[in-house]
Amino acid sequence: MSKICEICGKGPSFGNNVSHANNKTSRIWYPNLQKIKAVKNGTVRSIKVCTRCIRSGHVTKAL
């Protein structure tokens, strides 16, 4: 199960948690993915899409 948007290809970002003592530990920020039924290439499929693609209308939800 990949954590990548099937429309825009947005995936995880990598960085560090930084404490007050300036200690750094690596961490990952995941995109807000939703599993929705959408029309893709004329067929209804269940796809993982980020909320930005849903809000901006890049995806048409199946009824």
Swiss-Prot record:
Q: What is the lineage of its organism?
A: Bacteria, Pseudomonadati, Thermodesulfobacteriota, Desulfuromonadia, Geobacterales
- Keyword annotations: Ribonucleoprotein, Ribosomal protein
The cross-references to HAMAP family, in alphabetical order and at most eight, read: Ribosomal_bL28
Q: Name one GO molecular function term.
A: structural constituent of ribosome
Q: Which Pfam families match?
A: Ribosomal_L28
Any one GO BP annotation for this protein? translation
Q: From the Swiss-Prot or TrEMBL record, give the protein name.
A: Large ribosomal subunit protein bL28
What PANTHER family would the database entry show?
50S RIBOSOMAL PROTEIN L28, LARGE RIBOSOMAL SUBUNIT PROTEIN BL28A
What organism is listed for this UniProt entry? Geotalea uraniireducens (strain Rf4)
Where does the chain cross the membrane?
none
Query: Would you indicate the residue range of the signal peptide?
Result: none
Its family? Belongs to the bacterial ribosomal protein bL28 family.
Q: Which GO terms describe its cellular component?
A: ribonucleoprotein complex; ribosome
